[in-house]
Regions:
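P-loop NTP-binding module
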Residues: 1-148
């Protein structure tokens, strides 16, 4: 799991890890990515690292391609956490470098037109959208019987 939200990184806090060195440090210094273990078996995190002045510039470099290749040697599946598509160009820039993008939509927060705009931005950047997931959806009490 790679924290590519270089403007507002959060995975280090979520998993109680050291923030640095991380993704940007590996890119800027051409060093091995500092993967950190978590309490979740077989889950390794590469934190965002040092905040760069312009994240989109870093995400667009060939060094990111090289880092992705190095990570592919270490893991079967790599997930990149990126900032919102509509807010900054970072997700579209990164999305063009990976196999596919999963849009994460928040129930009751993400407006339909924002989701549609995000889809348009990614399609314009020739990013493969593999799907979407809805978070924070309320639990329907009628479904509880199914799991009982």
């Amino acid at each position: 799991l790679v924290d590519c939200d270089l403007r507002r990184p959060s995975l280090h806090t979520l998993f109680n890890l050291k923030a640095e060195p991380g993704f940007t440090d590996a890119i800027l210094h051409n060093s091995e990515p500092m993967l950190q273990g978590t309490a979740v078996e077989n889950l390794w995190v590469l934190t965002a690292g040092t905040k760069p002045p312009n994240p989109a510039d870093i995400l667009g470099t060939p060094q990111v391609d090289q880092l992705i290749a190095r990570l592919q040697e270490k893991a079967d599946i790599i997930l990149f956490d990126a900032p919102p598509v509509n807010a900054v160009t970072d997700a579209a820039v990164l999305g063009a470098k990976v196999d596919g993008v999963l849009l994460v939509l928040s129930a009751g927060k993400t407006r339909r037109e924002h989701a549609e705009r995000a889809k348009e931005i990614l399609e314009k950047a020739r990013v493969k959208i593999i799907g979407a997931t809805l978070t924070n959806a309320p639990v329907d009490s009628s479904m509880e019987a199914y799991y009982s």
